[in-house]
């Protein structure tokens, strides 16, 4: 496994990370994977991007010069290292329960010229979250590059995963009159290659203006509690031989179609409110 040297001792107790996630809606871990591993992951993402952008439904706009691409697990050379990593599995099980599901693999890629996104969450909040303060899904993120200030860093407003949101546009986009609150709470994230973050996709966030000529691909692994329902937004596939070779712990959690031959993914999760971006 491509675990950064010296990291193993840090994954024994994740209680503090779970508490941080519950409080802030996001938590990060430094140096989880080697830079060499992330370099291969970046190549996988960019290869997939240039293939996807050439076909309808392959790359979905998340604003000007910003796209989201979903992947089949087999397109990610380090997929098994990712979904069996003890910190990732430990966080998923601690927050979502032992029967958590892997429902999404994809990546977001802003290029030079990408604009600020509106403040948003990735889907409407369920009653379990806005009433009972229970997180029912997680997104694990890994950057493909060392993020610098000109690369449109991710901004997140800690603690906003509990905001109700039922009165918002699409239940995902706060009224612009409330944006100053999120800007006041916002923290800019500057992860390096090898770092992993774990967040609730309900925590209010946005991508920011990207001036660098270097693209900033970020892998997303989406994980659900049973019955959270986000698998319906995605269409992962694996071949029969790949599925049979998976360890049982992954096979029983991976929500996907098992097929004779992979076909390109036509994406289902188009977030209309992000297409135009903001200045």
Language-model segments: residues:
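Non-heme Fe(II)-dependent double-stranded beta-helix
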Residues: 2-24, 29-130, 234
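Non-heme Fe(II)/2-oxoglutarate
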Residues: 2-6, 11, 203-279
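Aromatic-acidic/polar surface patches that form glycan- and anion
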Residues: 34, 77-84, 133, 183, ...
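Generic beta-strand structural signal
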Residues: 98-105, 115-117, 134-142, 152, ...
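Short edge-strand/loop segments of extracellular domains
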Residues: 111, 157-164, 222-228
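Active-site glycine-rich loop that binds ribose-phosphate moieties when present
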Residues: 121-128, 142, 174-182
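Short, conserved beta-strand element in jelly-roll/cupin
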Residues: 129-149, 190-193, 198, 221-225
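Double-stranded beta-helix
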Residues: 147-208
């Amino acid at each position: 496994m491509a675990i950064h040297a010296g990291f193993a001792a840090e994954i024994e107790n994740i209680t503090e990370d779970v508490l941080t996630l519950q409080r802030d809606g996001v938590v990060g871990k430094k140096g989880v994977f080697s830079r060499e591993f992330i370099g291969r992951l970046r190549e996988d993402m960019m290869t997939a991007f240039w293939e996807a952008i050439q076909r309808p439904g392959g790359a979905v706009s998340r604003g000007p010069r910003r796209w989201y691409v979903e992947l089949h697990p087999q397109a990610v050379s380090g997929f098994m290292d990712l979904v069996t990593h003890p910190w990732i599995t430990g966080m998923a099980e601690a927050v979502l329960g032992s029967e958590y599901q892997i429902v999404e693999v994809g990546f977001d890629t802003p290029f030079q010229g990408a604009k600020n996104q509106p403040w948003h969450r990735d889907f409407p909040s369920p009653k379990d979250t806005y009433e009972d303060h229970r997180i029912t899904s997680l997104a694990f993120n890994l950057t493909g590059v060392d993020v610098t200030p000109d690369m449109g860093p991710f901004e997140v407003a800690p603690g906003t995963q509990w905001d109700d949101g039922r009165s918002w546009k699409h239940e995902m986009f706060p009224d612009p009159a409330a944006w100053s609150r999120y800007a006041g709470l916002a923290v800019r994230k500057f992860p390096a290659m090898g770092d992993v973050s774990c967040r609730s996709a309900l925590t209010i966030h946005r991508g920011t203006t990207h001036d660098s000529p270097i693209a900033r691909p970020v892998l997303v692994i989406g994980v659900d509690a049973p019955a959270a329902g986000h698998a319906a937004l995605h269409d992962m596939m694996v071949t029969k031989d790949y599925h049979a070779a998976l360890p049982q712990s992954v096979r029983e959690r991976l929500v996907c179609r098992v097929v004779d031959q992979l076909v390109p993914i036509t994406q289902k999760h188009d977030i209309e409110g992000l297409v135009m971006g903001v200045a």
